């Protein structure tokens, strides 16, 4: 029902492919790409569930039209910094890759069009993400954020899976394990804490690198980690279990602080130095309570599949259920959403 109520799941909604994708401090047109990718994803889900070929044909049309129209890719404009270029490529790339992966078996998507789409998504989004993770645009890796590295990693992994490209898959996975930047799981965690409330046993609350920045970005890392781990899981690689479920530990810490934003929370916190902003001495309250998709995936994987306790993630999933596509419940520039539909066990 949530999916059917979304205006982006309507095959009659007009899409709007652009010649280039750009993002800057005043906005840009990247949202146009994100919402069209979200529409393709939601229509692909409708086709996969119901077999509705009208939805399938529209999803394919969106993907084909973007591949044919967006010839200038993610361009550097006079208003756009390198970080804006990276964020446009990182967040849009994986969102186009996901509906394409669903639709790859649809007989109505011509083989030559599918091959052209794979070429387009690779040349448009991959080079920027690879360059950024390689040298962070000639800056120090610690000067960046988790929410910069993670979408770049996710887009490379998603393109690798879509294109059956083992080199891209392995690059993204290696970065998760041992990369220099904040997307590496070793660098994502500032400190491990015990839960003063006793709901999480042992030192299994992981304070993430952006908890002292603001909660809008800290909560964004939950779906990014969730989608990255799920994409790997779909090809037989279990990152969810890595280092005794450390991704869950990150999510539990974030959920504990954000799930009930008006309540006082006894939250242990370790001050840390950010290369981008200096010392973060207290947990940031800005944006506290931000609701994003991703909690259903985390909850269902850890609790329903693995049988692991995840009280705060479970509470967040229950709060947002049924999960739509972003805070607006339809589509959002950073998140695919619809986890209740996709991951409920």
Predicted regions and their residues:
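Extracellular glycan-targeting catalytic surfaces
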Residues: 1-138, 150, 154, 174-177, ...
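Histidine-centered active-site/metal-ligand motif
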Residues: 145-148, 217
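Active-site-proximal binding-pocket segments
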Residues: 167-171, 191, 197, 210-235
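Solenoid-like repeat scaffolds
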Residues: 178-182
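Flexible internal linker/loop segments at domain or repeat junctions
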Residues: 183-210, 277, 281
């Amino acid at each position: 029902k949530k999916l059917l109520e979304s205006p982006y799941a309507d095959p009659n909604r007009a899409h709007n492919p652009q010649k280039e994708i750009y993002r800057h401090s005043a906005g840009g047109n990247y949202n146009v790409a994100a919402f069209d990718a979200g529409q393709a994803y939601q229509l692909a889900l409708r086709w996969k569930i119901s077999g509705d070929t009208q939805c399938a044909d529209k999803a394919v049309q969106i993907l084909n039209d973007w591949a044919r129209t967006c010839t200038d890719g993610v361009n550097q404009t006079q208003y756009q910094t390198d970080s804006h270029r990276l964020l446009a490529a990182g967040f849009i790339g994986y969102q186009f890759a996901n509906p394409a992966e669903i639709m790859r078996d649809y007989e109505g998507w011509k083989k030559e069009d599918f091959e052209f789409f794979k070429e387009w998504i690779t040349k448009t989004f991959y080079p920027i993400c690879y360059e950024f993770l390689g040298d962070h645009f000639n800056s120090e890796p610690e000067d960046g954020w988790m929410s910069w590295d993670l979408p770049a990693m996710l887009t490379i992994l998603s393109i690798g899976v879509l294109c059956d490209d083992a080199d891209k898959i392995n690059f993204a996975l290696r970065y998760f394990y041992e990369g220099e930047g904040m997307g590496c799981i070793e660098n994502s965690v500032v400190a491990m804490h015990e839960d003063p409330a006793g709901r999480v046993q042992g030192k299994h609350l992981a304070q993430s690198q952006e908890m002292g920045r603001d909660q809008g970005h800290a909560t964004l890392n939950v779906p990014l980690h969730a989608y990255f781990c799920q994409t790997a899981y779909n090809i037989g690689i279990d990152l969810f279990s890595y280092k005794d479920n450390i991704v869950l530990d990150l999510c539990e810490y974030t959920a504990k602080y954000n799930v009930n934003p008006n309540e006082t929370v006894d939250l242990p916190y370790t001050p840390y130095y950010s290369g981008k902003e200096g010392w973060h001495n207290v947990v940031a309250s800005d944006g506290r309570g931000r609701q994003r998709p991703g909690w259903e995936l985390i909850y269902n994987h850890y609790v329903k599949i693995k049988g692991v306790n995840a009280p705060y993630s479970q509470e967040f999933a229950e709060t947002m259920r049924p999960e739509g596509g972003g805070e607006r419940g339809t589509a959002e520039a950073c998140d695919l959403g619809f986890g209740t539909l996709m991951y409920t066990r």
